[in-house]
């Protein structure tokens, strides 16, 4: 075995002068990447001595490790991790690229006169047989975005010689947090060298966190295949299985992919992960694709598997509007023939954005100058002078049947409203206008002047080419009420048309939408001092176009004024939304403590029946005497992965302060421990996440699954200041914790409220019962300062007059106390303390 001996610190290569066996072969000097010789253990032992370790890596001239020979270098060896005498020859080497595929990006011509012809040729070259739609799904931090970036570089959309980054993470908050929040689409053009066949591969990079599972479900609806990524060292994790089952529900072709093969230390790690994947999903080990995004290996094989195994779309092809054809005489035979061949447009709207919340502003920053048009304010300007306008809404669609072009008037199925399409195109890798989007393609459409209230994610965009075409009447409301199934095939669509054709008309069916998602975390958002609620409402509405899973309701608080109650899919979702409000719209907001979604059932109801459960909150609270049979509290399974030295502190806090129950604990790799707790979602909101981060100095990670509901003894606690209810401080808690919780809030208010000319009573109520009370004493003037001697009755008279005056002032100032945001923020912080 030829070996490269490298110091564990990664400082430099060993010099041969220290080793007789090496010196005899090389006559001194430092070895290079191509001049390594065998080193005997005797020389190493005599030079290093006991207790010192070296890193050994087999040369790529021998049977390969996890990579190709082209990736070998002295720098790679010098930075290798230390693993002592773990010498091995990999049986899971990544195959070298066959160089059968080449990226052929099609650039907009600089000459405006050539642009129209270019757009037409771009579409003509892509029949459905040459289109592939694939979503990239995985657990958190398993390498989805990095692999997507490497795929874009392989296809020449990004510089091939650049370092692999995170191009598809376009939002500022994504770049700062280092996670994917929004699913991003990019169309890749590949050509087979042998045959010259060109393929259009639409890649959708999806988030991995459970809070953004709604993004994943929408992306899967627009795909025929899913690349299921698994980190070779982490193995199969919770979201891996969640994404697998989501893809299975959609009847998608699943391609298993192992990522980060450059981090592997032994074959045992690969074999363990392959066994996990096969046992948990049934995907065969021999079908797994090995990749390394950082070294850009295995990318061509992944693309080849996408082309070979993912089925092409099967929609009905054809024009969908007479405006898409040259002008014809109304009574001509050619026109009648063409009208019979028109195919109604059916397109699934699975994402929307505005120029303010697009995340496309920095899209061209890292792309080659020759391949990306100028990007400004979320819009892409074509080289020919045309630009995608800003004042409107962009929609990301998957065309099922027909064709959509600029100027096509489409009907939104569930609202029945018609809007004209101004621009269409693909994302390549930024907004890239084309002449049309045909059946099977994924691309964007732009609607000028479209209002947010007219847009429903999951709606069907359609056209009625002739009078014989009609739309099926559906119930009004958001389209997310139906569960998504596999897109109808051309045969199924044709059979539907045949069934209705006997009556002389053709019924256009809507595309099934997405499953309804219920928010699990609620928080009140109030504008910063000096900011009007209208500005906050406009910013929230624009952001909700891009994030439709957020629910919005109006709030009115006597202390804070008007606000909004927003519902989110999780705590990370709430934090990200708040950060996007600040980064994209400059809105600083005061956020009340997050409240989880509690449920109740009527008297004589079954708590185990989800159909009988109804949501309850502080705004619509009902007591048992009002017909409530039982309250239900959400519980989650929290998974903590922490360095072992921090385990005791985290475990103690989880069991004692956050009502956690340990379900599982296992050592991962000798240095890290995985622990699973069953705990209330409310306790997670009140500070368990912060405790995990602070106890582990930021090294531990925490994830949780979807909540399940269990019965609990809940009460609503109200805070009253000077006889005025402060709705922002009302909360739902367990009955036995209400007193402790109340004293903490009342104590914080007493410390931070400014004194006034009258006493301010502070009360915490459960129903009509006072469970905690404090008083902020009023300022008192020393009315006896000028009385130096004499009868005490003179002083008592002054004191009594002062007391009566205070009582008169108190009667006039009932409920008129004004809270500064700093005071309320301190009280809100007390609600999350343990």
Curated annotation (Swiss-Prot):
Gene3D superfamilies: 3.30.70.240, Elongation factor 4, C-terminal domain, Elongation Factor G (Translational Gtpase), domain 3, P-loop containing nucleotide triphosphate hydrolases, Translation factors. It holds the Pfam family LepA_C. The lineage of its organism: Eukaryota, Discoba, Euglenozoa, Kinetoplastea, Metakinetoplastina. Belongs to the TRAFAC class translation factor GTPase superfamily. Classic translation factor GTPase family. LepA subfamily. Its main location: mitochondrion. Residues 129-314 form the tr-type G domain. It is an enzyme of class 3 (hydrolase). It is a peripheral membrane protein. It is found in: Mitochondrion inner membrane. Residues 475-507 are annotated as: Disordered. Coiled coil: none annotated. One of its GO terms (cellular component) is mitochondrial inner membrane. GTP binds at residues 138-145, 205-209, 259-262. Residues 1-66 form a transit peptide. It comes from Leishmania major. Residues 488-507 have a biased composition (Low complexity). InterPro entries: EF-4, EFG_III/V, EFG_V-like, LepA_C_sf, LepA_CTD, LepA_IV, P-loop_NTPase, Small_GTP-bd. Keywords: GTP-binding, Hydrolase, Membrane, Mitochondrion, Mitochondrion inner membrane, Nucleotide-binding, Protein biosynthesis, Transit peptide. GO terms for biological process: positive regulation of translation; translation. It catalyses: GTP + H2O = GDP + phosphate + H(+). Promotes mitochondrial protein synthesis. May act as a fidelity factor of the translation reaction, by catalyzing a one-codon backward translocation of tRNAs on improperly translocated ribosomes. Binds to mitochondrial ribosomes in a GTP-dependent manner. Its EC number is 3.6.5.-. This is Translation factor GUF1 homolog, mitochondrial. GO terms for molecular function: GTP binding; GTPase activity; mitochondrial ribosome binding.
